[in-house]
Amino acid sequence: QRELKLSAEGIKKYEQQTYYAGNWKPEYDKWVDMLAGLNSGPGHKKVAWNSALIYDMIYSQPVYYELPDLRVPTTLFIGTADTTAIGSDIASPAVKAQLGHYEVLGKEAAKRIPHARLVEFDGMGHAPQMEAPEKFNQALIEDLEPK
């Protein structure tokens, strides 16, 4: 039901807080328009259902304990100001204060994944690929180059 009520205004507010660490640039509007369009277009009920399934998976199937089992090359691209946390909008203030600290979570996840590489984007939120595409692309290309 929550997904059926999404609006462009709500999406922008959420993305500004989490994706862009409180900042906003006009070039981010297209991503809000895309999500708002998906959530208001003719397929909006399917989009909402798929989103609900993703939320259910996140809530009911944590994978943190499985990170040490990864055997593929893994690079984590993390914005240190990311505060994304599923459920933070319905959490109590005390619980919310403990969620979404990616400056810590990124390092913890990288330690748990064998041979993981952590690339941090200082001061950036959940979407460094959109916030600073040149910087992100350079880091990605460097990571993909043969060692």
List each model region and its residues:
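Conserved serine/cysteine hydrolase catalytic core
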Residues: 40-112
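Helix-rich cap/lid subdomain of alpha/beta-hydrolase
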Residues: 1-39, 45-61, 66
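Secondary-structure boundary/capping signal
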Residues: 22, 74, 117-118
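Catalytic active-site module of serine/aspartate enzymes centered on a nucleophile-bearing elbow/loop
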Residues: 103-147
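Residue-level signal for alpha-helical context at structural boundaries
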Residues: 32-33, 53, 88, 127, ...
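Short, glycine/charged-enriched secondary-structure capping and boundary segments
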Residues: 1, 89-93, 133-136
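Residues at helix-coil transition
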Residues: 19-20, 40, 114, 145
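Intrinsically disordered, low-complexity regions enriched for glutamine and histidine
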Residues: 39-43, 124-127
